């Protein structure tokens, strides 16, 4: 996939697992590895936004046909979509889309994506903290 300049589905499945685990250090390492393969941050974050969209599509049988991937990958999407709430996915799509919109005008694009990744990995963590406090 490196030659085609197309990021593999596995990168996004891995990134999403790390986000759901609130694992910011490993997520930043994965992003750095992706950059070192020659991909840019914009490509990474827009792909991640699409991945979140596809996970949301998997959560309802009526929208499953909107997923344009093979059977094996569809199964992976369905499995991962069970781990992510609709609220999480909406927030994640919103954050990734916001990063996409700001990317071209950002003076520090890498930091913008890294900050977005940290925010993404904190979505469910914040919820846990709120539960502990109340």
Question: What is each residue range found by the language model?
Answer:
Residues 1-133:
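Extended, largely alpha-helical regulatory/partner-binding modules appended to the mid-to-C-terminal parts
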